[in-house]
């Protein structure tokens, strides 16, 4: 697993107009600029994990602030913007079916390109950036697991209980409006998903089909895996859950997919930070498997 990479997909969410997040939507574009400049947590953690970072703008609503890209510490920015953020899912589908497919294809094509690069690709971590995306992830989780919306909806960026209840009501309204059918994963994704989530679906499918292990970051990345596994159930065996976040829906989705997290540290940052931590542990496990002597080969006596 020498060729390690982390893909961070970015996109905005129209549902933020309903007051479901503690942060303004412009934070998405600002954080993408930070990823490229090398100042974010994922930049630091990816270097520690020996992984290169690629940032995919598939649906950021605002222009990325100009800054100074750092070719050493920063991530490489790839722009494949399908649209400037999703629509408000409480009023209309988050995106059209064709837009969902285009975002999936953007993630798929990027992973294919990463595989073809001289550096290659042996292990892929996936994460995201998008204010409002825990709302979309909770909606997807409710549809595919059948769990009540309240059970899969947490505090996201740190909202209080009053706003969390508002978030639950917003998701319930969106699901009542669209009545998404879990037998139609693309339709569900288009109705209540996100552009960056769709891109991660494509990335997960492309890597898994190529037999490349995929390390899922947190709740949103795992929600993307839900969609990917609904499309191709065999994909689950190629995924590794990096951690279990504080979001209640994350635990339920991991159980639904039959995944056990590598670590359980109450992480809630996003941006693939947990995936970077887990990649280091996965690499250590592979090194042990490949390089550590057995008692027999080392001439060590067994139990008396």
Where are each of the predicted segments found?
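N-terminal loops that bind phosphate or other acidic moieties
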Residues: 1-304
């Amino acid at each position: 697993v020498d060729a390690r990479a982390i893909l961070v997909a970015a996109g905005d969410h129209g549902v933020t107009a309903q007051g479901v997040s503690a942060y303004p939507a412009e934070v998405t574009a600002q954080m993408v600029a930070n990823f490229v400049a090398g100042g974010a947590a994922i930049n630091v953690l990816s270097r520690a994990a020996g992984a290169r970072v690629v940032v995919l703008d598939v649906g950021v609503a605002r222009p990325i602030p100009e800054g100074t890209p750092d070719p050493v510490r920063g991530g490489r920015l790839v722009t494949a913007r399908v649209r400037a953020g999703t629509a408000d899912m409480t009023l209309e589908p988050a995106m059209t079916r064709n837009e969902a497919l285009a975002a999936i294809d953007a993630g798929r094509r990027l992973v294919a390109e990463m595989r073809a690069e001289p550096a290659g690709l042996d292990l892929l971590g996936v994460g995201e950036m998008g204010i409002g995306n825990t709302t979309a992830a909770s909606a997807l989780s409710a549809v595919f697991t059948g769990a009540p919306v309240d059970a899969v909806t947490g505090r996201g960026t740190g909202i209080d209980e009053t706003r969390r209840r508002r978030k639950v009501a917003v998701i319930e309204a969106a699901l009542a409006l669209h009545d998404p059918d879990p037998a139609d994963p693309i339709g569900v994704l288009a109705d209540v998903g996100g552009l960056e989530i769709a891109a991660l679906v494509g990335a997960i499918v492309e890597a898994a089909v190529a037999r490349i292990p995929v390390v899922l970051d947190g709740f949103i990345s795992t929600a993307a895996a839900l969609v990917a596994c609904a499309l191709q159930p065999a994909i689950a065996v190629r995924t590794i859950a990096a951690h279990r976040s504080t979001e209640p829906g994350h635990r339920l989705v991991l159980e639904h997919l039959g995944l056990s997290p590598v670590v359980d540290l109450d992480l809630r940052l996003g941006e693939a930070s947990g995936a970077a931590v887990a990649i280091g542990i996965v690499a250590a496990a592979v090194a042990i498997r490949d390089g550590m002597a057995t008692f027999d080969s080392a001439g060590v006596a067994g139990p008396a």
